[in-house]
């Protein structure tokens, strides 16, 4: 039989934060295409000036500078270092980035802007909307400041850890594909 895991109170609080105040669920959405690898693309405000322009280098469009694939969060506890360049070694550092370290940027994905979620939802429903759209006539988009408390950050991390299947670290069939 399958052992079902019941979330603790702390993990449930983290799950609620994931989909509300922390806004994680606006980008890290459940798979829709079944591929399991990436969910979309976004500029998450890592840099103001880019040593790696991401999709912008492939497209030739400066509006896409700083845009990278958004991975799903399956087994997130096992996939450090984090971000396209490995700049964060812990989930705490990632949470801190989203909590107060997002840099203002004209290409910042709207989900991380200081717009409220209702405004974001209404903009995303427009036929011509793109999450990498330069807003405000090219002015820098101000990032959200989540304001997560120490307790909320701990709850969010606790939930993120539930997305990891520890069985793959113990079961020999997953150890060496060659």
Could you describe each region identified by the protein language model?
Residues 1-178:
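Periplasmic c-type cytochrome electron-transfer domains
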């Amino acid at each position: 039989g399958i052992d079902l895991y019941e979330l603790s109170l702390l993990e449930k609080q983290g799950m609620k934060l994931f989909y509300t105040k922390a806004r994680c669920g606006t980008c890290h959405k459940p798979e829709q295409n079944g591929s399991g690898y990436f969910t979309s693309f976004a500029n998450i405000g890592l840099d103001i000036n880019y040593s790696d322009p991401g999709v912008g280098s492939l497209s030739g469009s400066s509006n896409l500078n700083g845009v990278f694939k958004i991975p799903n969060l399956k087994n997130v506890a096992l996939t450090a270092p984090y971000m396209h360049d490995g700049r964060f070694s812990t989930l705490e550092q990632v949470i801190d980035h989203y909590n107060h370290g997002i840099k203002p940027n004209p290409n910042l994905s709207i989900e991380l802007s200081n717009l409220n979620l209702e405004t974001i939802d209404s903009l995303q429903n427009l036929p011509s909307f793109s999450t990498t759209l330069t807003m405000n006539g090219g002015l820098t988009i101000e990032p959200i400041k989540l304001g997560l408390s120490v307790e909320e950050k701990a709850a969010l991390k606790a939930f993120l850890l539930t997305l990891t299947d520890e069985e793959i670290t113990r079961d020999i069939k997953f150890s060496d594909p060659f």
